[in-house]
Amino acid sequence: MSSKITIIGAGSVGATIAYTLSSQDIASEIVLIDINKQKAEGEVLDIIQGTCFRDPISIIAGDYEDAKDSDIVIITSGIARKPGQTRLELTQTNVNILKSITPEIVKAAPNALYLIVSNPVDIMTYVFTKISGLPENQILGSGTILDSARLRCGLSEHFQIAQSNIHAYVFGEHGDTSFIPWSGAYISGVSVDEYYELEKKLGKDIEPIDKEAMLQYVQKSGGEIISKKGATFYAVSSSVCKLCSLLVSYSESISTVSTMMHGEYGIEDVCLSTLTLVGPNGVQGKVPMRMNKAEIEQLKKSADALKEIIAQIDLN
């Protein structure tokens, strides 16, 4: 596929995204940029030496000017939370990094679609939207794409059914106040509860879904992986690359990306994840999903939690 994708940040996530893109025929050109140029060069060399087994692709460790004419820019820069560091301290540190990156990359690639992956992703997407000066359709965060994938994985394991038959999503922030709007969760065209009853009638030995446990599975998976191997990067990279394939394709699709809210569900001036139509022109608009009153309140609670953090950070 003839597209140019620039990745800022050659850490575990950025490098794995570069590798995954190189193996999936999504991009014909990849530029990897990092403040540690030697690290980026090493990652690129490692990836290039495996490309002889695949279709030809151009991969370089570059600078901001090399991002010119990029179709997509993926921002993964940031640091992980340190022991004793508060969430607000981490947020401000990563916001400062984003503020230092934004002018140069936007100058080099003003027409690109920008995919924010750095955490806390909803706040970073909000900050980039405010400081970049770009149209909002060009900006989206990875949001709860991975959370939604984890949900489908959990439901697939529980019901022993292919994930392609499951349509269920995680809304809100990519974090502690995320939630599952079960009103819009379906398996093969019927609600999750109805599907359970159907399975029981067919004589399947199956337990009903513990919805709170499923939410905990979604929210705690990242922490469990980090505690066991130190970082998460395979699943998030797969999620990001899937989104990139949508952004460079000729069709549109619905995804739970983080975008600016403008009154949907009574929420304004914050970025979080709901159903959003995305395609080659970026963000096309929100797709309303029927939710009950309690679920709408959960979404507002998530928005309020994000706004509380935003109110305390320095954007100047």
Q: Where are the regions that the model predicts?
A:
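Glycine-rich Rossmann-fold phosphate-binding loop(s) that bind the pyrophosphate
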Residues: 10-11
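Rossmann-like NAD(P)(H) cofactor-binding subdomain of soluble oxidoreductases
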Residues: 86-153
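C-terminal substrate-binding/catalytic lobe of Rossmann-fold NAD(P)-dependent dehydrogenases
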Residues: 132-138, 148-316
